[in-house]
Amino acid sequence: MALLFNEEQRLLQETAQDYFQNNFSTKTLRQMRENQDALCYVPELWQQMVEMGWTGILATEEEGGLGFGFKGVGAVLEPAGKTLAGSPFLGTVVLGGSAIQLGGNGAQRAEWLAKIIGGEVRFALAIDETPRHDPNVCKTTATKNGGGYTLDGEKLFVMDGACADQLIVSATTEAGPTLFIVDAKAAGVTRHRLAMIDTRNAARIVFKNVQ
């Protein structure tokens, strides 16, 4: 089935193609790999993406975004992939933004989507506990504790997990699987950066008595 863009989406695609071709190359990736760059992306270039409005591609117009949906996401990710461009776009805008849109309450959507669009926060989706993705495995627990929860467990291969500001963590509660937004610097959160073959920023994250 053909993927047809409207005029605005075609303009986005052309802008993204020019931007990535002019600003990214395999040489950039190799330099970050050789320097063992902790972020695995260039903050100044990420800020330019924010200023171009790309962080609002997935959010609806009512949420303050562009409302381009996943067609818009594809228009950016395709040329990004061709140049091996590293950025928080996939982890923050696509995975983090989607999780908040689909699972967040009204207050959470209003707060966090605005911060994503404004480039104020970087998210990482922490859901895997095995070497291969298996959503049925979730040994991380969230125990009711007064007005909140206490998280205990471990997540593996968390993309952007070593540099994210906020984590979206899957945990098992009495009600079943639940997602929690956790400050990456909260007490009890320990992040271990992983050396990945694709040089992506990834981490093993341990949660011990996280409130």
Report residues per predicted region.
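Cytochrome P450 C-terminal beta-domain/meander region
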Residues: 134-152
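A generic, well-ordered mixed alpha/beta core segment in the N-terminal half of proteins
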Residues: 103-120
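N-terminal glycine-rich flavin-associated loop
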Residues: 85-107
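Amphipathic, small/basic residue-rich leader segments at the start of a protein or domain
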Residues: 1-90, 111, 115
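Flexible, small-/acidic-enriched active-site or ligand-binding loops
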Residues: 137-139, 143, 157-158, 183-211
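A short core secondary-structure module
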Residues: 126, 152-192
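A short, Trp-centered hydrophobic/proline-enriched beta-strand micro-motif
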Residues: 119-130
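Short glycine/proline-enriched turns and hinge-like loops at secondary-structure junctions
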Residues: 68-70, 134-137, 160-164
